[in-house]
Amino acid sequence: MADKGRLKIQCYVNDTYIPVDGTKAILKPSSGQEGESKEINLVTNSSGETEIIELDAPPFSYSQEPSRPTPYSLYDLRIERPGFQDLLINGVQIFSQSLAIQPCNLIKSSNTRSSRADVINIAPNTLNGNYPAKIPEEVDKPLPPPTSGVVLPKPVVPEFITVHAGSPNNDSAPNYKVPYKDYIKNVASCEIYSTWPESTIRANIYAIISFTLNRIYTEWYRGKGKNYDITNSTAYDHAFNYGRNLYDSISAVSYTHLTLPT
């Protein structure tokens, strides 16, 4: 692997943006990965961020054409900080010529919130993994009645969105309430490549936003008695991987397209 990608780690208190300094980050290639196998030790600064480091990645060309080998390398990350629970993140995805950003929401040792796991396993990108195909929906379909008794005059961009980490038929799967802007970036990082041209990334983000706002505006799941807005099953909605790494190129495009035009 002659090509290089980059990684920055960000550590915050729980689901806030309060930085955690002095956090130790231990990074190593995932099992079966080529290249250097040595551990890399990093420490967060007063902003809760590590320095940006270069890591081995497959050739850039792999991400530009279909039917090529997996275009990203995988790394496992362990986060340690006194006063907080350890966090393990397996399968951080590094593309050539791309900056990956790994957010780490650390739980204080005295906090035992059940919805937050200590281990995050990042699933393959949908272009590489084995995911169920989208179940076709009728173009004109009856909409469930609004749960509030009030019909919104136009789509509203929410501050938060609740994601069900499973199919609609899996009531045991956890729900995650995350900032809407972070949800869009997470979905894009799951479904497209960060190395694509800016115009291609933008077109995909438009599609993700449109579909997501439709689910919220129509109260597609809440109108059926569910306690969430959307699922992470590709058979019904978008892929979403709680706690996965994001990308600077995707975040930059998302930032300018997360509100509706006036």
Where are these regions (language model features)?
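A short, solvent-exposed loop/turn motif at the edges and junctions
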Residues: 60-90
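Second-shell loop/turn segments in exported
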Residues: 189-201, 237-243
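Short, acidic Ser/Thr/Gly-rich low-complexity loop/linker segments typical of extracellular
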Residues: 33-63
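Acidic/histidine-rich, surface-exposed loop or edge segments in extracytoplasmic proteins
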Residues: 166-168, 179-196
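Conserved small/polar residues in nucleotide/adenosyl-binding loops
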Residues: 256-262
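Extracellular beta-sheet/turn segments enriched in Thr/Pro/Gly and aliphatic residues
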Residues: 87, 92-129
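Short, ordered, surface-exposed loop/turn motifs in non-cytosolic proteins
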Residues: 15-39
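Beta-strand-rich domain onsets/edges
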Residues: 1-7, 12-19, 42
